Amino acid sequence: MAKEETIQMQGEILETLPNATFRVKLENGHIVLGHISGKMRMHYIRILPGDKVTVDLTPYDLSRARITFRAK
């Protein structure tokens, strides 16, 4: 079975929460809960409030996202 396509969006980190979780404000104004992807965790990429990030949303739960990239 093929996986469902993810929705990629741009956002900004609003606040840091425990367990590598962040509150992210998307371009369209929605606020979602985001967690760091495994590769970002492996390479110790730090994310701070105010950073611009790319997130992946699944069609199943649009209130949670996976943070896949931090803009420089």
Swiss-Prot record:
Residues 1-72 form the S1-like domain. One of its GO terms (molecular function) is ribosome binding. Keywords: Cytoplasm, Initiation factor, Protein biosynthesis, RNA-binding, rRNA-binding. Signal peptide: none annotated. The keyword Transcription regulation does not apply. The keyword Cytoplasm applies. Its main location: cytoplasm. Pfam families: eIF-1a. Gene3D superfamilies: Nucleic acid-binding proteins. GO terms for cellular component: cytosol. Component of the 30S ribosomal translation pre-initiation complex which assembles on the 30S ribosome in the order IF-2 and IF-3, IF-1 and N-formylmethionyl-tRNA(fMet); mRNA recruitment can occur at any time during PIC assembly. Belongs to the IF-1 family. NCBIfam families: infA (TIGR00008). This is Translation initiation factor IF-1. It comes from Nitrosospira multiformis (strain ATCC 25196 / NCIMB 11849 / C 71). The lineage of its organism: Bacteria, Pseudomonadati, Pseudomonadota, Betaproteobacteria, Nitrosomonadales. The gene is infA.
